């Protein structure tokens, strides 16, 4: 009988390994080891991965051994020792230490280069014209100032001119005929106890003035400062109040004095006393009898009363009243 070589399967080798591991170690043939080495040489090292080409511990360990190879470096060139100079030169240090003086002044450094802006020819011509005009104006002003400064100023006070006598051209008749307008009424209402005194006519006043004394000019009436006799000239000492310091003679009349001259009393409360107005009560039943007494139509009387109730006391006083004589004279 011929001998037949039987290739062991992985399962048989695993079983034999598990079964014979207790008795003897596994023996692998040299041909299998060579075959595995060839296969490993064909596969590039970058594509080797234990997940793709099996999970055996041998493959993984071989990959780690290939990656962790020791690289021997070439020996470096010979070191050339640097020759040190035999004579050492020591620098001499100064004995005196000179401290640097700090300057208090801050020196601002100016930039060395100027920024030059390029301009067109038109702009350059305009700027030149403006500069020429400005120079001309400055020259004119300087010439005017020099001409003004050349004329010497007259120092000293100007001589006072003699005061001219003012002659009043306004006649006394014109002064009397044009009095200042008064805001007071000509006559107060009847309910005022105190009334204004009757105003004199301007014509009568001028006649009295003309008959009493001849007309005099205003310049004759005014007093000169030499003619005024003050207590200081008489030798009297007078304690002036602050109000009298500005004016020695006070010609202003007080309001109470002027009121006293007009109404005869200075008590304002008595001047403003008024009579109580009379009140009449008129009933609707009395209207017919009142109309017959006044000889007026009843409806007309009612209309007049309605109108008067809406008016004030001042409006009623200003209302024009027609007398019976005027109505009779009209044809």
From Swiss-Prot:
Name its cellular compartments. Chromosome
Q: What is this protein called?
A: Meiotic recombination protein P22
Q: Where is the composition biased (Polar residues)?
A: 168-181
Q: What does this protein do?
A: Required for formation of the mei-W68-mediated double-strand breaks (DSBs) that initiate meiotic recombination.
Arranged from A to Z, the UniProt key words for this protein are: Chromosome
Which cellular component, as a GO term, is one annotated location?
chromatin
Sequence segments annotated as region (Disordered): 132-187
Residue spans with biased composition (Basic residues)? 152-167
A biological process (GO) annotation for this entry?
Answer: reciprocal meiotic recombination
Q: Record the organism.
A: Drosophila melanogaster
Upregulation details from the record are: Expressed during early meiotic prophase.
The UniProt family comment states: Belongs to the TOP6B-like family.
List the gene name: mei-P22
State whether keyword Cell membrane applies. no
Q: What else is known?
A: Despite weak sequence similarities, may correspond to the subunit B of a mei-W68/spo11-containing topoisomerase 6 complex specifically required for meiotic recombination. Retains some of the structural features of the ancestral archaeal Top6B subunit (AC O05207).
């Amino acid at each position: 009988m011929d001998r037949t070589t039987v290739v062991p399967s992985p399962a048989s080798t695993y079983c034999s390994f598990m079964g014979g591991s207790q008795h003897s170690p596994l023996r692998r043939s040299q041909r299998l080891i060579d075959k595995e080495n060839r296969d490993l040489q064909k596969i590039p090292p970058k594509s080797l991965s234990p997940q793709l080409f099996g999970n055996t511990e041998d493959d993984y360990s071989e990959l780690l051994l290939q990656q962790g190879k020791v690289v021997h470096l070439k020996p470096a060139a010979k070191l050339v020792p640097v020759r040190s100079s035999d004579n050492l030169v020591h620098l001499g240090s100064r004995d005196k230490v000179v401290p640097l003086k700090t300057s208090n002044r801050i020196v601002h450094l100016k930039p060395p280069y100027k920024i030059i802006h390029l301009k067109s020819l038109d702009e350059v011509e305009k700027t030149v014209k403006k500069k020429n005009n400005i120079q001309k104006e400055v020259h004119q002003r300087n010439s005017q100032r020099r001409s003004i400064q050349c004329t010497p100023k007259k120092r000293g006070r100007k001589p006072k001119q003699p005061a001219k006598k003012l002659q009043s051209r306004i006649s006394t008749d014109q002064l009397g005929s044009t009095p200042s307008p008064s805001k007071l009424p000509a006559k107060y209402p009847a309910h005022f106890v105190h009334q204004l005194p009757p105003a004199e006519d301007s014509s009568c006043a001028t006649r009295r003035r003309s008959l009493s004394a001849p007309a005099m000019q205003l310049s004759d009436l005014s007093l000169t400062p030499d003619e005024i006799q003050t207590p200081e000239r008489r030798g009297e000492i007078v304690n002036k109040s602050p109000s009298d310091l500005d004016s020695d003679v006070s010609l202003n009349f007080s309001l109470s004095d002027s009121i006293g001259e007009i109404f005869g009393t200075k008590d304002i409360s008595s001047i403003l006393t008024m009579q109580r107005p009379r009140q009449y009560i008129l009933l609707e039943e009395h209207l017919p009898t009142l109309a017959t007494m006044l000889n007026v139509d009843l409806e007309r009387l009612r209309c007049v009363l309605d109108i008067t109730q809406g008016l004030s006391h001042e409006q009623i006083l200003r209302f024009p009243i027609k007398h019976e004589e005027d109505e009779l004279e009209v044809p």
